[in-house]
């Protein structure tokens, strides 16, 4: 496989950007080697600058649920751009997308559009603090909620790959208001509330963790977190930046029957354009400026092109589309498990809907500690063998892979065939 142009571009990029990239996980630090520079994408495939074609399971880290360059999404964006790329004023497209969100998630009684998932989560935290008059928040070890200072404590995603439990630059006075507990461990959370319950403004969680790889909630865990929040007067914030509109038309909240106080969105809601949102209970959201005193603002919030892209993509995500995703994702997970068994490589394939991770572990993976115990060297060998055989996976053991409605049975078959070779390569690594 030729990679000369990617290598040359990476050399130039290292002179221009920290680590040669504009988001850490793209640098391949978790797997080694040269990141591929992508020239174009269509459907379920991406093509790098050297002309190598890959079945894409990164999908821009989740947003491209209908695939790359879907004609209806492209048409919607082009039509919006003809009318103006940004107004800095309200537009009808904001209403269209918001109404569709509330139609599918009635518990989002009011919402605010922003420009990223990080902006959504940091805003939700501010709102929770302002609404409750409390300062502390609780997050779970390994859950990533964006790059905001209060949330870079025991975070997953790129922080996990780099082995940084916290980030320099986050003041101790900020970090001390972020309390943590292990994911899937209700008794541990109960102890946190027993110690600090009166000062806790909110608990924020990924309902299905995607940023330590996919961690599946144990039965009763999510509702248990909600019940503890209600008991102690804290808000229950569900971070659906990754899971929203991906796991079902109602996201993870719809899938698991949750009714959060606040919920955050990103990724799918913008179909590849920069969009985030937060929303929830009417009485809470009515405290947000200009209706209330809790300030939040953004120059590009509700950008008309982004609103058009999100609306077009969500309209395409019918119940039939979700059924197709489930069938394809189950086939891929089963195929990967079988290929690993053939190679006698112990793995755990964790999956919920169209999110999955192959963990190189003998034991079940259900929290940050069990994820960190995985064999990342084997994952690196597996990743590079898959890349050589035309399957583009997340370049980290601690990230989720995604499928789109553009993926086909042939894509899955090609990927499973590549995995047979890749697991054999991984088996050679101690």
UniProtKB/Swiss-Prot annotation:
Pathway: Porphyrin-containing compound metabolism; protoporphyrin-IX biosynthesis; 5-aminolevulinate from L-glutamyl-tRNA(Glu): step 2/2
Cytoplasm listed as a keyword: yes
Protein name in the entry: Glutamate-1-semialdehyde 2,1-aminomutase
Primary location group: cytoplasm
Co-factor(s): pyridoxal 5'-phosphate
NCBIfam families xref list: hemL (TIGR00713), PRK00062.1 (NF000818)
UniProt xrefs under SUPFAM superfamilies: PLP-dependent transferases (SSF53383)
PTM sites of type N6-(pyridoxal phosphate)lysine: 267
Subunit structure: Homodimer.
GO CC terms in record: cytoplasm
Species this protein is from: Anaeromyxobacter dehalogenans (strain 2CP-C)
């Amino acid at each position: 496989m030729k990679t000369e142009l990617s290598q040359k571009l990476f050399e130039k990029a290292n002179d221009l950007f920290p680590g040669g990239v504009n988001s850490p996980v793209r640098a391949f630090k978790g797997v080694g080697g040269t990141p591929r520079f992508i020239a174009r994408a269509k459907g379920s495939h991406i093509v790098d600058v050297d002309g190598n074609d890959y079945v894409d399971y990164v999908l821009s880290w989740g947003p491209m649920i209908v695939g790359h360059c879907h004609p209806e999404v492209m048409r919607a964006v082009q039509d919006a751009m003809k009318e103006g790329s940004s107004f800095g004023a309200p537009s009808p497209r904001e209403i269209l997308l918001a109404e569709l969100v509330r139609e599918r998630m009635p518990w989002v009684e009011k919402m605010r559009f922003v420009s990223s998932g990080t902006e959504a989560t940091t805003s939700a935290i501010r709102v929770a603090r302002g609404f409750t008059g409390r300062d502390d928040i609780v997050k779970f070890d390994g859950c990533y909620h964006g790059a905001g200072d209060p949330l870079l404590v025991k975070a997953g995603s790129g922080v996990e790959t780099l082995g940084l439990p916290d980030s320099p630059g986050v003041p101790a006075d900020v970090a001390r208001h972020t309390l943590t507990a292990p994911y899937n461990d209700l008794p541990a959370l109960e102890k946190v509330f027993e110690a600090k319950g009166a000062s806790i403004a909110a608990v924020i969680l990924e309902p299905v963790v995607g940023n330590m790889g996919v961690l599946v909630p144990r039965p009763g865990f999510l509702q248990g977190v909600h019940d503890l929040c209600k008991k102690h007067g804290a808000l229950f914030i569900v971070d659906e930046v990754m899971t929203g509109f991906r796991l079902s038309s109602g996201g993870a909240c719809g899938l698991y029957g949750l009714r959060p106080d606040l919920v955050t969105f990103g990724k799918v809601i913008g179909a590849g354009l920069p969009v985030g949102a937060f929303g929830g209970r009417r009485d809470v959201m009515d405290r947000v400026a200009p209706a209330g005193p809790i300030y939040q603002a953004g120059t590009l919030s509700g950008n008309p092109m982004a609103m058009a892209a999100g609306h077009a993509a969500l309209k395409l995500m019918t119940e039939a589309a979700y059924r197709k995703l489930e069938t394809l994702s189950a086939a891929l997970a089963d195929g990967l498990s079988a290929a690993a068994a053939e190679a006698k490589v112990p793995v755990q394939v964790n999956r919920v809907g169209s999110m999955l991770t192959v963990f190189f572990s003998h034991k079940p993976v259900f929290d940050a500690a069990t994820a960190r115990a995985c064999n990342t060297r084997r994952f690196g060998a597996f990743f590079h063998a898959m890349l050589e055989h035309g399957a583009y996976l997340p370049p980290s053991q601690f990230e989720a892979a995604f499928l789109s409605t553009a993926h086909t049975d042939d894509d899955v078959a090609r990927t499973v065939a590549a995995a047979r070779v890749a697991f054999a390569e991984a088996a050679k690594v101690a």
